[in-house]
Regions:
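Peripheral, non-transmembrane regulatory/ligand-interaction domains of membrane transport proteins
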Residues: 1-197
């Protein structure tokens, strides 16, 4: 996949300790889709899904590989995630390679890239997917804890009969919970199947 370095959407090509390669590309270049289908040999439908901006969480097994699409946190400067800021992580894995594409940087991808660059991190594509999901779920858990803290604060205000003070927080928290459920709810089935697929 060395040819990718001459493609406008190229971001990095890293080698895992087990010998598999990881190609990471940006979807904001029209050449990315054609490169994925013509040079890497991905099925045209898979290549199209890997560059689509509007994706829903899903998993598709194709031949000897697996495509996983997930919604990830895109944290703001204050470390808080918002449903409207969530972006897609698009991952293709097969026996010898990982291909990912992005519209915006997300921490799980950046952290894995740093680990692999330093000779650490996952050794195989299956390990890569497991580590990526683990990092992703850690970020989700942190945001859920923040929401729980907000709910507890609202509960305290209501107990003290400070309804007027609680109302704005109630509306914001309800909106956030609904938004996260819309994006994260479909991932339950995807993550269950993906954990089985890489075993």
């Amino acid at each position: 996949m060395i040819e990718a370095e001459r493609t406008p959407g190229f971001l990095h090509l890293l080698q895992m300790t087990g010998g598999a390669s990881w190609l990471h590309m940006c979807i904001h270049h029209r050449e990315t889709e054609s490169f994925l289908s013509s040079v890497t040999g991905l099925d045209k439908l898979i290549a199209a899904a890997m560059v689509s901006e509007d994706t829903r969480s899903r998993l598709r097994v194709h031949g000897q590989g697996v495509m996983v699409l997930l919604k990830a946190m895109h944290l703001r400067a204050d470390g808080v995630g918002h449903p409207e800021d969530m972006v897609s992580m698009r991952i293709w894995i097969d026996e010898r390679r990982v291909i990912t594409t992005r519209e915006e940087d997300v921490d799980p991808i950046l952290e894995l890239a740093e680990d692999i660059s330093q000779g650490r991190g996952p050794a195989t594509p299956g390990d890569f997917l497991c580590d990526l999901i683990e990092e992703h779920l850690a970020e989700v858990s942190e945001q859920v804890e923040m929401l729980e803290d907000g709910v507890n604060l609202i509960g305290g205000l209501l107990v003290q009969h400070q309804t007027e003070a609680a109302c704005p927080s109630m509306a914001n928290t309800q909106t956030a919970i609904s938004g996260f459920l819309r994006h994260l709810g479909p991932q339950r089935a995807v993550l269950g199947v993906s954990s089985f697929s890489v075993q």
